[in-house]
Design a protein with these regions (language model features):
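N-terminal loops that bind phosphate or other acidic moieties
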Residues: 1-46, 50-191
């Protein structure tokens, strides 16, 4: 599954880019198609993303629900991450338990911090300085929610600043926590 083909920066015209309004839903939909085809190992190629949703869209496409303080569903976009109060996982596709997922990307990409995805890549995706900080706060909050919703997969990972967690707008963190995906460099996957 190639991130750039499903949610790539080049798919959004330069004057319309807004990483707070884009989603990785298409990536999750492609994972679902791979599951339908009987895949036992799925490799997500990361790079050139137009998103900053922490993988929220992909998880929603695979059956998760994002709920606000009133229990209403929240659209899985970067600007909404701070509004999410709970990730409901009971509807996650059960086939995910039997598949190996590899997220192949730049292991230097971190989810948050000075080298985090919103600060490093937000401006090239169209984010204003204010939006960069709002996305950063949303991603910090999102990592906490991921750890609560997926404690088994998240327990041994540093979702905020672990290597590769910022791959493709934070897709690395979302899939590592939500699917137990292994984060690795593209080079390692090819060899």
């Amino acid at each position: 599954v190639e991130m750039a083909a499903a949610a790539g920066l080049r798919l959004v015209p330069a004057g319309m880019r807004d990483p707070g309004a884009t989603t990785t839903t298409g990536v999750g939909e492609l994972i679902s198609v791979a599951l339908d085809g009987g895949a036992r190992r799925i490799i997500i190629g990361c790079g050139d993303s137009g998103t900053c949703d922490g993988g929220a869209g992909a998880l929603v496409a695979l059956g998760a629900r994002l709920l606000d303080a009133d229990g209403h569903e929240v659209d899985p976009i970067g600007s909404n991450l701070a509004r999410v109060r709970r990730i409901e996982t009971s509807g996650m596709d059960p086939r995910l338990r039997d598949v190996e997922v590899l997220v192949a990307g730049n292991m230097h990409n971190l989810l948050t911090g000075e080298r985090g995805v919103s600060r490093v890549f937000g401006p090239q995706k169209g984010a204003s300085p204010e939006q960069v900080e709002a996305l950063e706060a949303g991603l910090v909050h999102w990592a906490e929610l991921l750890a609560e919703a997926f404690p088994a997969q998240a327990a041994h990972r540093d979702l905020l600043t672990g290597p590769g967690t910022g791959a493709s707008g934070g897709l690395g963190a979302g899939l590592a926590a939500g699917l137990g995906a292994r984060l690795c460099s593209r080079f390692d996957v090819l060899m």
